[in-house]
């Protein structure tokens, strides 16, 4: 009897387990089916109709509340992501704050004008370069810029002047960053420039009308008068007979001295080196070169040297403008006359009287011998002044190329 009861109890337990298992399986199937149906409803494309105007689409199935709940959930998660991203951006900006370079104040850009004309010469051998902010000095709140301008008067051919135009400002920047002494850095810059020109001639890398046939290329050289303008100083380095003139309180002040063979100290130096100055259409080194210093002219070394004379002038409130020009201007126009012409232009007394397209009258303007860096445009008044000086030189029968740079130094304009 006990065995029958035990067997019945065992069968009942197995039957109950089977029923529970079937019920559980059925429930899971129903839950899975319900979940799949819900998923299909969520993923199916809702039919909606457009209404005129800017109203939102109206859903036909009346599921707007569920849609809004989903949108609020997405918006919350998006806000969280945006907040985290914003925090990362802030941290990144804080980490980079020490490396951010302040842009120069637009008012700090120099006002200048350039004119370079072939004049009565058959070939254009002058070159001009202007590089605003060619060297920058970063402070905590601003970027102080140094401005560079230079005039190069070539002789024998144009390739030395062109090389100076392309390279000398880079050498000046490199040397000044290595040693802040302007006189030493300028001297090293000119020496390196001279060595590069000599190497250029020896290697035959330049392509020009002298055809690199020695000794023709050894007879090619260029003057160089360059100026670096800082907020406190006017630095001028000169090698040759181009010139820099400052107008201060209406008076002309020469910031360079022409290197002519008959200048007493230059004559003594040439003779001490074993050279001679022969008067042939004016004083000339060995009767050939009308200047005692130049970049290049390898065949006249050591009598003709490339070492520049450097002047450093403190800027003052009375500074009006600076003129750099080749001897094509200074041979026929005095310092005082040149300053008077520029002063009239800057005061607007000749505004509109100078043609804006001088190429039709003067060969060489815009002929590719002028390089301007920094992305800014020349000042109209300074441009008119430089162009008027070239016209004055031609009117006074200048027989040379004429190149002029005018820089406005007034602080209140």
Swiss-Prot record:
InterPro entries: PP2C, PPM-type-like_dom_sf, PPM-type_phosphatase-like_dom. Binds 2 magnesium or manganese ions per subunit. Its cofactor is Mg(2+); Mn(2+). One of its GO terms (biological process) is leaf senescence. Induction: By abscisic acid (ABA). Induced during leaf senescence. Induced by osmotic stress. Mn(2+) 1 binds at residues 153-154. Disruption phenotype: Delayed senescence. Increased sensitivity to abscisic acid (ABA). The keyword DNA damage does not apply. One of its GO terms (cellular component) is nucleus. GO terms for molecular function: metal ion binding; protein serine/threonine phosphatase activity. Pfam families: PP2C. Keywords: Golgi apparatus, Hydrolase, Magnesium, Manganese, Metal-binding, Nucleus, Protein phosphatase. It comes from the Eukaryota. Residues 111-409 form the PPM-type phosphatase domain. The keyword Metal-binding applies. PROSITE patterns: PPM_2. Mn(2+) 2 binds at residues 153, 327, 400. Residues 21-40 are annotated as: Disordered. It is found in: Golgi apparatus; Nucleus. Belongs to the PP2C family. Acts as a negative regulator of abscisic acid (ABA) signaling for stomatal closure in leaves, and controls water loss during leaf senescence. Activated by the NAC029/NAP transcription factor during ABA signaling in senescing leaves. Functions as a negative regulator of osmotic stress and ABA signaling. Acts as a negative regulator of response to drought. This is Probable protein phosphatase 2C 78. It comes from Arabidopsis thaliana.
């Amino acid at each position: 009897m006990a065995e029958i009861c035990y067997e019945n109890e065992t069968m009942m337990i197995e039957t109950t387990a089977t029923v529970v298992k079937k019920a559980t399986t059925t429930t899971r199937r129903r839950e899975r089916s319900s979940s799949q149906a819900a998923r299909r409803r969520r993923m199916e494309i809702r039919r909606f109709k457009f209404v005129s105007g800017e109203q939102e689409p109206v859903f036909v199935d009346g599921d707007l509340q569920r849609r809004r709940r989903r949108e609020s959930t997405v918006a919350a998660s998006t806000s969280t992501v945006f907040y985290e991203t914003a925090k990362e951006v802030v941290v990144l900006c804080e980490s980079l704050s020490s490396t951010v370079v302040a842009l120069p104040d637009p008012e700090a850009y120099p006002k200048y004008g350039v004119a370079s004309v072939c004049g009565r010469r058959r070939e254009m051998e002058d070159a001009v370069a202007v590089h605003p902010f060619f060297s920058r000095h970063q402070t905590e709140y601003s970027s102080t810029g140094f401005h560079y301008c230079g005039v190069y008067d070539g002789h024998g051919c144009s390739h030395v002047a062109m090389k100076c135009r392309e390279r000398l400002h880079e050498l000046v920047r490199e040397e000044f960053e290595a040693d802040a002494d302007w006189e030493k850095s300028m001297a090293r810059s000119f020496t390196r420039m001279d060595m590069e020109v000599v190497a250029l001639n020896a290697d035959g890398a330049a392509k020009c009308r002298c055809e690199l046939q020695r000794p023709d290329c050894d007879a090619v050289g260029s003057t160089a008068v360059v100026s670096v303008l800082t907020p406190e100083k006017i630095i001028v380095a000169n090698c040759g007979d181009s010139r820099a003139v400052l107008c201060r309180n209406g008076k002309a002040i020469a910031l360079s001295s022409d290197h002519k063979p008959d200048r007493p100290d230059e004559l003594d130096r040439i003779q001490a080196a074993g050279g001679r100055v022969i008067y042939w259409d004016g004083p000339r080194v060995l009767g050939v070169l009308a200047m005692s210093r130049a970049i290049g002219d390898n065949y006249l070394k050591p009598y003709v040297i490339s070492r520049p004379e450097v002047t450093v002038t403190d800027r003052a409130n009375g500074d009006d403008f600076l003129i750099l020009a080749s001897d094509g201007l200074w041979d026929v126009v005095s310092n005082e006359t040149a300053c008077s012409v520029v002063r009239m232009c800057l005061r607007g007394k000749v505004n509109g009287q100078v043609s804006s397209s001088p190429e039709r009258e003067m060969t060489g303007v815009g002929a590719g011998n002028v390089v301007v860096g920094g992305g800014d445009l020349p000042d109209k008044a300074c441009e008119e002044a430089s162009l008027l000086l070239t016209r004055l030189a031609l009117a006074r029968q200048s027989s040379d190329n004429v190149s002029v740079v005018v820089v406005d130094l007034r602080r209140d304009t």
